[in-house]
Curated annotation (Swiss-Prot):
The gene is greA. One of its GO terms (biological process) is DNA-templated transcription elongation. Pfam families: GreA_GreB (PF01272), GreA_GreB_N (PF03449). The keyword Cell membrane does not apply. Necessary for efficient RNA polymerase transcription elongation past template-encoded arresting sites. The arresting sites in DNA have the property of trapping a certain fraction of elongating RNA polymerases that pass through, resulting in locked ternary complexes. Cleavage of the nascent transcript by cleavage factors such as GreA or GreB allows the resumption of elongation from the new 3'terminus. GreA releases sequences of 2 to 3 nucleotides. NCBIfam families: greA (TIGR01462), PRK00226.1-2 (NF001261), PRK00226.1-4 (NF001263), PRK00226.1-5 (NF001264). Gene3D superfamilies: Transcription elongation factor, GreA/GreB, C-terminal domain, Transcription elongation factor, GreA/GreB, N-terminal domain. It comes from the Bacteria. This is Transcription elongation factor GreA. Belongs to the GreA/GreB family. GO terms for molecular function: DNA binding; RNA polymerase binding.
């Protein structure tokens, strides 16, 4: 079974999404299909086909979430040693050594990642380049624009 690392917050968010899909979205889509069937000929019934497509997406997402929750490896950074190392679940402040621009990222599971909110996947190139390093260390990270060197300014265990 594949393991899916996630924070307790990420696990709770997936459970909430699953509950929404099963208790609200699935019944709504089923009702839409039943209503569209009443309109007659299913071959040329766009509403019916759209509702069936929605049902397919909904069921696929339910299966995906159930698989991830079943293989969830919940990692609470609050319970891990706070030794200044970059690990899953921490926030890290890095400085681009060329531009001196500072950025802060929180390293989270794939489903929690939101780059605009400063949350990066543990599987992203930046996170992979930072994991295991400590405050003051330098990291060479390969990006689409080439290799970028960062200095780890601070590790925050939140």
């Amino acid at each position: 079974m594949q393991r899916y690392p996630m924070t307790p917050q990420g696990h709770a968010a997936l459970e909430a999404e699953l509950k929404q899909l099963k208790s609200i979205d699935r019944p709504r889509i089923t009702a839409s299909i039943a209503e569209a069937r009443e309109h007659g000929d299913l071959k040329e019934n766009a509403e019916y086909h759209a509702a069936r497509e929605q049902q397919g997406f909904c069921e696929a997402r339910i299966r995906d979430i159930e698989a991830k929750l079943g293989g969830a490896q919940i990692i609470d950074p609050a319970t891990l040693p706070k030794d200044g190392r970059v690990i899953f679940g921490v926030s890290v402040v890095i400085e681009n050594m060329d531009t001196e621009e500072e950025k802060q990222y929180k390293i989270v599971g794939d489903d929690e990642a939101d780059f605009k909110a400063g949350k990066i996947s543990v599987n992203s190139p930046i996170a992979r380049g930072l994991i295991g390093k400590s405050e003051g260390d330098e990291a060479r990270i390969e990006t689409p624009k080439g290799v970028v060197e960062y200095e780890i300014m601070k590790v925050i265990y939140d």
